[in-house]
């Protein structure tokens, strides 16, 4: 088994992978590096700077009963609306994320998997199975916001490596439409944006999520290379990947929509 370690690059970003394992997160997380907590926290601070409306709302709440000229009724309503808008936009993005994942899976299935039995073991092969994330809405609704956002970020981080290597290999597949490649690129971009959203709204869950992923870091080694000599094996692996991405994107969409309806108080 290949040993992997999690590390963070202070300058980070989701470009090419840092070291053989590749990037894992929107914070510049990489496999194969060493821990740099100061670098991680600097990245988090920059995320937090974009979440000032949240902090201002909290400040106004703390000012109840005290004279706070900058936190009048109009200001509070405006800031609250701004926060709600952020969640609404995230819910729209997560919907598109799942929708595009479904379209990409359906196109791949139609072109490569007709008459095959790939679907039989597809669910069992998902690299995120070890996290036991809630499948059904009623179970997800029983979770508090912190746990729900934690599972959302776990799933999103878990797909950074597979998506990176998937994009590298898709370009070498014969007769694959440009639409599938474009969809994969857009899905990767959407995932980065959703990660940034969760990181900015639920800052304190980031380190626990990274530790959780570190405990099952063996799940990444499978994607260090997706090149197979047998074409049928290769197509089977891609099928499983598309299948699992569709499943996990549905979970992400469901979790974010629950968080949004709670923020809007419409649940």
Curated annotation (Swiss-Prot):
Glycosylation sites: 99, 121
Membrane spanning residue stretches: none
Main location group: secreted
Disulfide bonds: 126-244, 261-267
Compartment(s) where it occurs, according to its Swiss-Prot or TrEMBL record: Secreted
Keyword Secreted tagged: yes
GO molecular function terms attached to this record: hormone activity; prolactin receptor binding
Cited CDD domains: prolactin_like
Domain of life of the native organism: Eukaryota
GO cellular component: extracellular space
Keywords recorded for this protein, A-Z: Disulfide bond, Glycoprotein, Hormone, Secreted, Signal
The keyword Thylakoid belongs to this UniProt entry's keyword annotation: no
Pfam families (UniProt xref): Hormone_1
Gene Ontology biological process terms in this record: cell surface receptor signaling pathway; female pregnancy; mammary gland development; positive regulation of biosynthetic process; positive regulation of lactation; positive regulation of receptor signaling pathway via JAK-STAT; response to nutrient levels
Family classification: Belongs to the somatotropin/prolactin family.
Task of the protein: Placental prolactin-related proteins may play a specific role during gestation.
Protein name from the UniProt record: Placental prolactin-related protein 2
């Amino acid at each position: 088994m290949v040993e992997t370690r999690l590390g963070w690059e202070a300058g980070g970003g989701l470009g090419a992978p840092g070291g053989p394992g590749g990037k894992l997160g929107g914070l510049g997380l990489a496999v194969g590096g060493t821990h740099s907590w100061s670098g991680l926290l600097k990245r988090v601070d920059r995320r937090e700077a974009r979440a000032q409306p949240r902090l201002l709302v909290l400040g106004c709440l703390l000012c109840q009963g005290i004279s706070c000229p900058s936190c009048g009724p109009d200001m509070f309503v405006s800031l609250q609306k701004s926060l709600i808008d952020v969640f609404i936009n995230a819910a729209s993005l997560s919907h598109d994320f799942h929708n595009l994942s479904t379209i990409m899976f359906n196109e791949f299935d139609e072109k490569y998997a007709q008459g095959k039995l790939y679907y039989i073991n597809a669910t069992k092969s998902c690299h995120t199975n070890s996290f036991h994330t809630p499948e059904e809405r009623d179970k997800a609704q029983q979770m508090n916001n912190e746990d729900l956002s934690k599972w959302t970020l776990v799933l999103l981080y878990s797909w950074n490596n597979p998506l990176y290597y998937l994009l590298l290999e898709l370009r070498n597949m014969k007769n694959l439409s440009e639409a599938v490649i474009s969809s994969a690129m857009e899905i990767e971009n959407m995932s980065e944006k959703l990660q940034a959203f969760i990181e900015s709204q639920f800052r304190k869950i980031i380190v626990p999520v990274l530790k959780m992923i570190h405990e099952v870091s063996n799940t990444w080694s499978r994607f260090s290379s997706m090149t197979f000599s047998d074409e049928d094996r290769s197509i089977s692996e891609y099928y499983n990947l598309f299948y699992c991405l569709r499943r996990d994107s549905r979970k992400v969409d469901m979790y974010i929509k629950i968080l949004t309806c709670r923020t809007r108080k419409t649940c």
